[in-house]
């Protein structure tokens, strides 16, 4: 380690050595130790280094496949039980309080989740993927975003809980930026390079290189 570079970095960011070491321990060393434990248990599917946050639960980890340098933040719930599992590319970050669930009923397994290389998912995101949820490479997904890859059927002829669900899936292309608290509904396909403004509700497809905002989301302009 080049200590002069570390010192210069600390000074440039107004950090003292105690703050730096605390951050390094809580965000790096301790999650890495937790990750090594699960990586050894699933060595053929979870690649080292893998970082697992405090009080994070990974259920059915035999259905989880990761690339290198994946990070899952504190207090997250990851239920991987599904037909195709949960597949994370290299350097995927899933921040604190994430909720990923694919299957809620073992008699009707969900499809799975695929997240591409170097994609960042912010804190308190919900990824519900009864149908397949696919997110591309190098995406930035803000805090509190919800993906809902399933929809309830309804009519006036019977009770809601008796009417079942439909499943189409959600696809997000590469290099997309999805703002805080966006909701993306089942059946939506989002092209490469799309920007979606905070709080939008996406109910239909968004073509590549578009900027979309609002509820329901509408195309505002092209991304240049």
Where are these regions (language model features)?
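Domain-scale signature associated with acetyltransferase and cell-envelope carbohydrate enzymes
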Residues: 1-148, 173-174, 208, 217-224
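Glycine-rich hexapeptide-repeat left-handed beta-helix
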Residues: 133-224
